[in-house]
Amino acid sequence: MELAAWCGWGLLLALLSPGASGTQVCTGTDMKLRLPASPETHLDIVRHLYQGCQVVQGNLELTYLPANATLSFLQDIQEVQGYMLIAHSQVRHVPLQRLRIVRGTQLFEDKYALAVLDNRDPLDNVTTATGRTPEGLRELQLRSLTEILKGGVLIRGNPQLCYQDTVLWKDVFRKNNQLAPVDIDTNRSRACPPCAPACKDNHCWGASPEDCQTLTGTIAPRAVPAARARLPTDCCHEQCAAGCTGPKHSDCLACLHFNHSGICELHCPALVTYNTDTFESMPNPEGRYTFGASCVTTCPYNYLSTEVGSCTLVCPLNNQEVTAEDGTQRCEKCSKSCARVCYGLGMEHLRGARAITSANIQEFAGCKKIFGSLAFLPESFDGNPSSGIAPLTPEQLQVFETLEEITGYLYISAWPDSLHDLSVFQNLRVIRGRVLHDGAYSLALQGLGIRWLGLRSLRELGSGLVLIHRNTHLCFVHTVPWDQLFRNPHQALLHSGNPSEEECGLKDFACYPLCAHGHCWGPGPTQCVNCSHFLRGQECVKECRVWKGLPREYVNGKHCLPCHPECQPQNSTETCTGSEADQCTACPHYKDSPFCVARCPSGVKPDLSYMPIWKYPDEEGMCQPCPINCTHSCVDLDERGCPAEQRASPATSIIATVVGILLFLVIGVVVGILIKRRRQKIRKYTMRRLLQETELVEPLTPSGAMPNQAQMRILKETELRKVKVLGSGAFGTVYKGIWIPDGENVKIPVAIKVLRENTSPKANKEILDEAYVMAGLGSPYVSRLLGICLTSTVQLVTQLMPYGCLLDHVREHRGRLGSQDLLNWCVQIAKGMSYLEDVRLVHRDLAARNVLVKSPNHVKITDFGLARLLDIDETEYHADGGKVPIKWIALESILRRRFTHQSDVWSYGVTVWELMTFGAKPYDGIPAREIPDLLEKGERLPQPPICTIDVYMIMVKCWMIDSECRPRFRELVSEFSRMARDPQRFVVIQNEDLGPSSPLDSTFYRSLLEDDDMGDLVDAEEYLVPQQGFFFPDPAPGAGSTAHRRHRSSSTRSGGGELTLGMEPSGEEPPRSPLAPSEGAGSDVFEGELGMGATKGPQSISPRDLSPLQRYSEDPTLPLPTETDGYVAPLACSPQPEYVNQPEVRPQPPLTPEGPLPPVRPAGATLERPKTLSPGKNGVVKDVFTFGGAVENPEYLVPRGGSASQPHPPALCPAFDNLYYWDQDPSERGSPPNTFEGTPTAENPEYLGLDVPV
């Protein structure tokens, strides 16, 4: 059924398409079942309305038509926008054979789109008895009607009507109109013949074969032609209505929505389109206005075009009506509040009013334009005593003398007998007729006692008919050129019941002789439509008073206009050329060039001026300026009328001065007294409030945030001992030192950051801010602050990390690092950053250089110089400026200075990339200013050669443009923990299983141990939470059998002069408290009994439970069963897993043809490193195991000084202006105090200021 709905016979081949050129549109009527105002002219009214009409824009109402009426003028109608009503008519047929669609935008009785009512012969019963064929509607003959979009059908009281019950109305109704009511009366007084045999299923509109109903909604399969049975091309387009001639939307017989130049569309083309290239709105040359169901290039006359592309009769809210010079009308948005307008009947608050009465007439006082209509009914002049409405008087009608335009209609069926015309509307120029009386009339006058019309200024009737009916004394109807007033061919004058021209001639009613073409609105010279000669005011005259007569005039076209009163009348020439005083030929009194004046100005202030002007007339009558131009107190004048010179008396000046001084003193004393009293009152009020106040001054506004109870330890300078300089920079110096707390016999290795002398307050504030941030941190993966020393130069005391920064560590040991080392570090850094996210701290400077190595298995995040704590209601931090590491931070941080935890995720991805490339420089060779453009174009760091796609995809996710698409740190912890359990699956390092088994001690570590003062030290964390030693821990005595086994480090020298750390079993350690950190202060790497470089012996293996639950560690980065923020609980009763990753056990590699792997360079080596392949563009590394040139990183600079005998080792990269990057031996490099060489951190090429455009 769905396919057949628009197939087969739905393709009507013989009918016109909706795009037929020259479509004639007419307005319908809205009289319902009311009797026509003029039955004599009713048929003429219908003919004028629908002659040649194809689309009825309103309702098609055919009522009260006589039996002999010729209705052939209806045969062109194809579409009705509203409803169709055929009622109380005696015609046998209505020729609407071409009507295709009834849209039902208005419905009869709010329900019916088609109503056929009481079309019968009044003498139906009599004619039947006498044998005469009765009149009345016999057949509908709507053979082309295939669509009713909205509304039902009502057919009643048609005794002669046949075939209405044979129509398949379900097929006529649109799919969404299937529930429309159908009320059909089949009671008839005659027998109806059957439908023609050609009509399938006996569906027809009449007896003729041409009247068979065309089915477009339900079609029997047998009715479909065999050659085109149910083909998709046999279906109409979805925008078609009433059938089609082909499958395209240009083949529709009628359009479902809008007809655009013969093509059916869902919407008309918009007037404005958006240009995506220039980001601006552009006029659409193909744009169309919506007019009914059509798309038109311009709105029809009398309709208003809107900005949204519609043709309307009333402007929308906050819009005003504007008429252009070419006569087009449009709605224009008011720049401010719209000016007040006068509403007539049918609009706004007068929507329910029927007529103009004494209760509402004053609303039209002073109105030049009325939006709406005017109607004068008998009740207007009779009043309504029950409602307290008095009768309308002739004097009250004078309010309409200023009226010039009516947008609706003017209907008058009652008028005062004392008024012989409609001269109260003498200035009315336009009746637009956008709303018509009964849907037909813009001007209707009936039953009046007036003698003539008197509408002398009326020049336009925009729409509708003119009805002048049954006015028994009205003349001059035929002397008005009505055709010049009409604006469309469907307009006409309908008159009846008025005096004839002969009767008016007998009354001596004729136009004034000077009226052009004999056209007038009444008798006399003021009622001419146009004048044959000249017009003076409202009168037609034969000539103007140019040379004679008073007042003198000048000619402007056909108008006689008076000269200015100050012009001297001339006899032989024109008195003036215009109506202004400067257009006179001569002046009768004086001339104040160029104006003629009655007298010269004396003390007159010109417009927009406060200075008076004094002039006197000379002998020729010309006004000359006075020598003295007095501005005030101009009393004494000379004989010419000019101000006389006056000398001011000194007494006046003295008096004025004295009075002014006294007044100033009095005011000063009064003001002083008032100020003193005011202060006393304020002081008194304040004391009273303080004595009586029982509540807090400020209201409580709790934020809900937890208090920061971190402790800040203040150290005395006597507790600190500086051993040697580790590095220097613009901020000051970093020392290796020892902290010896007062009263305790312990030595704690520390790093002391000392600001240099004369440091700016900003530097002091920044180091205190850094101390504030570090003091509140308590994670094993974040560097701890031990305290501050508030001397003249602030000193920051932190943990001393024996292995230096992670960047130097991976570069120095790139040939001896394994996959588990790298992945364990990734896990620990992610856990540290996850902790920072939990405490709402944005780091802003995460990089491998800012991660310190406490032990080869334990790293910590440091450098909180750029970190920012977020408040409880903050989710991001916006930087005001400063330097940032462009190549490490996220794109939104570069462009918008926006820093969040997700921007730290970006930096984490770059840090992982540094580890996986063994310390390569990101985006090497690319200037920092080009980084934003490069990132916006989608370029990212390349995949490191040792990384599998799994690891690289995590990096790529960290570098997503949308920060919300990046993973969270807790997700990164989970991902890298999973990879750390099976490291060689995710990080592939060649010959990893053959790598050296020597411990990963660094040159920096050896330099620390060479100092004699570094023995017998206690680790800072062990001092704060006691546990094993720092460099040379002693075995814990008295260890229980259920405690963890611990390690003891021993220091030996290898044959090559390298320092090796061995881990020997030291027995069992005592049980820890639940708050005590695990080995390495919470290291995530299991450090069982297998030490670095030690051989696993049988004695190191303790008995274990061989159950499946304990044979494998769930998390190889943390084999202990419970973790609480980096700390572990005792395992007194839980056996440890049997299989875990052992990152430190590597077999000795065999000798290769090229020889064994090169050892770490000794401290005194002076030979250059062999040149290696430097990283290419964007950090691509050709040889992952050779980074000889990567050590000379511009981020790290060495203080000037030192001797040639002890050059700076190339293996080290001490950081500049950072307390965690060390110099190998700066104490031996003499440098003048407070002098620095090199580039400070602020000038680091990896950091770029946010306040500089990038």
Swiss-Prot record:
Disulfide bonds: 26-53, 162-192, 195-204, 199-212, 236-244, 240-252, 255-264, 268-295, 299-311, 315-331, 334-338, 342-367, 475-504, 511-520, 515-528, 531-540, 544-560, 563-576, 567-584, 587-596, 600-623, 626-634, 630-642
GO process annotations (BP): animal organ development; cellular response to epidermal growth factor stimulus; cellular response to growth factor stimulus; ERBB signaling pathway; intracellular signal transduction; negative regulation of apoptotic process; neuron differentiation; positive regulation of cell growth
Biased composition (Polar residues): 1232-1242
Phosphotyrosine modifications at: 877, 1112, 1139, 1196, 1247
Glycosylation sites: 68, 125, 187, 259, 530, 571, 629
Residues modified as Phosphothreonine: 1166
Keyword list, A-Z: Activator, ATP-binding, Cell membrane, Cell projection, Cytoplasm, Disulfide bond, Endosome, Glycoprotein, Kinase, Membrane, Nucleotide-binding, Nucleus, Phosphoprotein, Proto-oncogene, Receptor, Signal, Transcription, Transcription regulation, Transferase, Transmembrane, Transmembrane helix, Tyrosine-protein kinase
Signal sequence segment: 1-22
Active site, per annotation: 845 (proton acceptor)
Protein kinase domain: residues covered: 720-987
EC number(s) recorded for this UniProt protein: 2.7.10.1
Residue intervals on the Cytoplasmic side: 676-1254
Pfam families on file: Furin-like, GF_recep_IV, PK_Tyr_Ser-Thr, Recep_L_domain, TM_ErbB1
Topology Extracellular: residue spans: 23-652
Subcellular location: Cell membrane; Cell projection, Ruffle membrane; Early endosome; Cytoplasm, Perinuclear region
An example molecular function term from Gene Ontology annotations: ATP binding
Region (Disordered): 1029-1116, 1133-1179, 1223-1254
Enzyme class: transferase
Modified residues (Phosphoserine): 1054, 1078, 1083, 1107
PANTHER family linked to this entry: RECEPTOR TYROSINE-PROTEIN KINASE ERBB-2 (PTHR24416:SF137), TYROSINE-PROTEIN KINASE RECEPTOR (PTHR24416)
Family as reported in the entry's similarity comment: Belongs to the protein kinase superfamily. Tyr protein kinase family. EGF receptor subfamily.
Protein name per the record: Receptor tyrosine-protein kinase erbB-2
